[in-house]
Amino acid sequence: MSSDCWTPFHARLHQLLQRRSLLPTRSRLLLAVSGGQDSLALVQLLRGLQPHWHWSLAIAHCDHGWRSDSTANAEHLRQLADQWQLPFYCQRSPEPPRSEAAARTWRYQVLEAIAADIDAALLVTGHTASDRAETLLYNLTRGSHLQGLASLRWQRSLSDRLTLVRPFLGFTRAETSKMVQQFQLPVWEDSTNRDRRFARNRLRLEVLPQLRQINPQCDRHLANTAELLADEADWLAELTEQVYQQSLSERGLCRSQLAQQPIALQRRVLHAFLQDQLQRSPSTVQVEELRQLITAPQGSCSSSLPQRRVAVVAGDWLRLQSVDD
């Protein structure tokens, strides 16, 4: 089907982009494309909307080298880009990343470099409401604070010059499947997406289908929950920063001020304090240990923290010091 054929899917995305101001007119967009159904559906809709928004579109593909068919996958996308008359950029990892986290880090480094080379201010991915639901469930199973449950935002800054945008969070994976059929898109199936050794794949292939039997709209409802949590997380982050700055001095954190705050806010302020002091995200156990020190007697201290440091009570102040002091 031609990209200039206007469908209800195009209309929905057009209205969503207007409402959320995600992809401004005449922007240069770098589209991260794997070849799967979500990213190809994204390209198809954006190509259809391009005459209305006057974007400059380019495709980027990151080849992790994990699969025997990864080179063929990249060539398939190169041919599609030629067919669509879009610039195509591809980079293969020097060696296969050892974990999903390492792959993600490498992938975003590559995409940021490509975006800088072509002067693109927006990196666009095909993450859907189903991905958001999956991420919410995944973080719940691991135990997560509010910020983790509110992950996969509509947009987030990657650097001073590049913003990641996810315009497909308004669609489910079932809907992108319908797009693939309607537009007859040549999807390249990634066999690793069906490998049940990965926790996310088990959620996608086993858990979410069971939840859909309880409520067929669970993907969208879970994604909406993540959206609500994101708004609350933003508000709490502002409040936390305000209380943190009010409680902080050269002597440490003021215990009497913290004692007046709700427990949830105490935890968030202490988390921010430890992260600033240690330059790493503290564990829940470490935060709780410090919270007990808010009302502890003079001279009390925590167990050892990273960098051979401990938290100690000094009058009305809670501060970190070296275990050697």
UniProtKB/Swiss-Prot annotation:
GO terms for molecular function: ATP binding; tRNA(Ile)-lysidine synthase activity. It comes from the Bacteria. ATP binds at residues 34-39. One of its GO terms (biological process) is tRNA modification. It catalyses: cytidine(34) in tRNA(Ile2) + L-lysine + ATP = lysidine(34) in tRNA(Ile2) + AMP + diphosphate + H(+). Ligates lysine onto the cytidine present at position 34 of the AUA codon-specific tRNA(Ile) that contains the anticodon CAU, in an ATP-dependent manner. Cytidine is converted to lysidine, thus changing the amino acid specificity of the tRNA from methionine to isoleucine. The N-terminal region contains the highly conserved SGGXDS motif, predicted to be a P-loop motif involved in ATP binding. This is tRNA(Ile)-lysidine synthase.
